[in-house]
């Protein structure tokens, strides 16, 4: 059993671990199917005349939990398929570009999956979905002269009040990748604090909290206070062809590339044992280690949740765990 996953377990989205069978319809479908009500009037943001937040009431959470489960499975499998696809290019022993880019996207998908398991979703609400949401809000007389726009939203479910709260990405938070990493960083900081706030804090809880804080510190490296360091490194490789990742591989020896490719299986290790803070090995190595930690954390949480279904029929066993087993053969 993973200590990291066990300590995080109390902070799962309540009820998610009990979702059974194959989950196939995500939040986008949930919005369109209209299993919710609207009792809160729309209000403009404090900085513009647009609506940046809306609240939906959820009388029956089962369909919403299935939507979370579906998105978690989809993103988890995308992460593991991406990391599994990394291979060296024959005849180019110093090439590391696709190693870095694929590791980034695997961690990006994994971060999304982790957030879903904690009850948070960074979701793109398109025009069709926003139209349906506005239709429901109109029916309940809560439009107040406004409309929910399309865009990227941070959505979270409050099971105590049975409310699904969505807040739109603001322009100063960058694109969808920056929005994801900002949200992930905020939720990881919050998780670390919650762990230390548990009654009778033990040494193992302190260890897990400290490791999560290390992750957050690394995500804020090199002038990225909102947690977007991984995205900034990805941009250097993907858009600027920097860090010696592409031909002519300036500053990268075959030995250096060999060491970077040794991280291909690092995500299969216990995340607590993956080093995060060392800067001596340079940005690419630290970048890969951080990505591996996030993917490992997602894997450990998925495996832990899959074993907690009351009837041993976890949606994970029909999705991500089944996919991991397929990769092992």
Question: Which functions belong to the PLM regions below?
Answer:
Residues 1-329:
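Terminal alpha-helical segments
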């Amino acid at each position: 059993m993973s200590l990291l996953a066990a300590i995080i377990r109390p902070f799962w989205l309540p009820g998610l671990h009990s979702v059974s069978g194959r989950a196939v319809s995500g939040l986008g479908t949930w919005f369109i199917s209209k299993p919710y009500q609207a009792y809160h009037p729309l209000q403009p943001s404090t900085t513009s005349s647009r609506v940046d937040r809306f609240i939906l009431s959820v009388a029956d959470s089962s369909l919403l939990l299935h939507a979370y489960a579906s998105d978690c499975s989809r993103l988890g499998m995308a992460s593991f398929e991406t990391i599994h696809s990394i291979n060296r290019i024959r005849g180019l022993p110093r090439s590391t570009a696709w190693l870095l880019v694929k590791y980034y996207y695997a961690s990006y998908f994994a971060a999304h999956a982790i957030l879903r398991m904690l009850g948070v979703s960074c979701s793109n609400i398109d025009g069709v979905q926003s139209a349906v949401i506005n239709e429901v809000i109109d029916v309940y007389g809560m439009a107040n002269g406004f409309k929910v726009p399309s865009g990227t939203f941070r959505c979270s479910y409050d099971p105590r009040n049975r409310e699904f709260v969505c807040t739109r990405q603001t322009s100063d938070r960058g694109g969808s990748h920056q929005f994801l990493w900002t949200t992930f960083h905020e939720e990881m900081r919050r998780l670390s604090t919650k762990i230390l706030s548990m009654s009778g804090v033990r040494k193992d809880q302190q260890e897990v909290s400290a490791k999560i804080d290390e992750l957050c510190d690394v995500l804020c490296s090199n002038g990225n206070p909102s947690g977007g360091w991984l995205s900034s490194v990805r941009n250097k490789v993907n858009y600027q062809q920097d860090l010696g990742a592409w031909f002519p591989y300036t500053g990268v020896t075959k030995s250096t590339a060999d060491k970077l490719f040794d991280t291909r299986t690092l995500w299969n290790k216990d995340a607590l044992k993956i080093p995060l803070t060392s800067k001596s090995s340079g940005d690419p190595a630290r970048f890969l280690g951080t990505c591996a930690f996030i993917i490992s954390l997602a894997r450990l949480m998925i495996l832990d949740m899959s074993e907690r279904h009351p009837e041993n029929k976890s949606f994970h066993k029909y999705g991500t765990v089944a996919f991991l087993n397929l990769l092992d053969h």
